Curated annotation (Swiss-Prot):
This is UBAP1-MVB12-associated (UMA)-domain containing protein 1. It comes from the Eukaryota. Coiled coil: none annotated. Residues 50-63 have a biased composition (Polar residues). Residues 32-44 have a biased composition (Basic and acidic residues). Residues 1-72 are annotated as: Disordered. Residues 86-134 form the UMA domain.
């Protein structure tokens, strides 16, 4: 009620959203702008963290095997790639899907390398009913 007596706020000219050639209007930052802001944030975080040197009782796990280092690097690379791919998605994944994504690195290699298409005979299905419906119409 009291806002009737106040001076109306000065209206700023709203920025015109970019329109693509196909007629869609882009809202928010583009992927390039998001990457630039993400890089800026990570460099700010890295710059603000104090350096830790020569701590004897550290609780961090050290990886000495080069193969394990390679797998750890690939896992980190895959998770950053997945995060980058999902950054443009306008919704979030369900919590149980996110939990599965987090535990996939804990699975043994023989389970991860299993190819489900090797044993397709167990997925056999008879389409005679569907074919008869299509042929009758």
């Amino acid at each position: 009620m009291f806002h009737f007596f106040r001076k109306p706020p000065e209206s700023k000219k709203p920025s015109v959203p970019e329109t693509e050639a196909d007629g869609f209007v882009l809202l928010g930052d583009t992927t390039d702008e998001q990457r630039m802001t993400a890089r800026g944030k990570t460099s700010d975080i890295e710059a603000n963290q104090p350096l830790e040197t020569n701590k004897e009782n550290s609780s961090s796990v050290t990886v000495s095997d080069p193969e394990m280092e390679n797998k750890a690097g690939q896992t980190l690379e895959n998770s950053s790639l997945m995060a980058e791919l999902l950054s443009d998605v306008p919704f979030t994944l369900a919590p149980h899907v996110l939990a599965v994504q987090g535990t996939i690195t804990d699975l043994p290699d023989h389970l991860l390398s299993y190819d489900g298409s090797e044993n397709l005979s167990r997925f056999w299905y008879d389409f005679t009913l569907e074919n008869s419906v299509l042929c009758d119409s």
